[in-house]
Amino acid sequence: MGLYLNPNADAFMQNRNKKIYVDKSQIIYELNDLIDSDDNFVCLSRPRRFGKSMAGNMISAYYSKGCDTREVFSLMKLGQEPCFDKYLNKFNVIKLDLNGWYQRAIQRNRKDLLLTDIHETLVDEFKVAFPALSFCSGETLDQCILKVYSETGEKFVIIIDEYDVLIRE
């Protein structure tokens, strides 16, 4: 379990434990229908302050192998669905908040290294998560993902929050 590869459910649990929380877990029911389909690339775009980050945290907590969230989701609306646990904690998840990465790059006055920093961090997490496989810093992220998939058959869910920060800023 890493910070970005197979993250835990802490961010989602913080959202879930807020005084005001709206259960939007049924979106996962809809997403589950898209897994292994031609429509498996999804973009959740809504106005600001609409809960996209919370949805990303929830989606990560549901799919990530880095946590066990059966008890949490069984008590939510999704838990009422017959196959709510079909994909529960079954995928390698990469979850990135590009705004956080961007802000750190700005603080260091190194926007030019933003993608390099993300890449190096993820390759380091791949090395820890999959010690039986060898990864080198020259490999691209897609090469790392394909290596894991070809060697283990394990699939990935990739969640990118604040994906528009590079265009917006």
Q: Where does each model-flagged region fall?
A:
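Phosphate-binding site recognition
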Residues: M1-E169
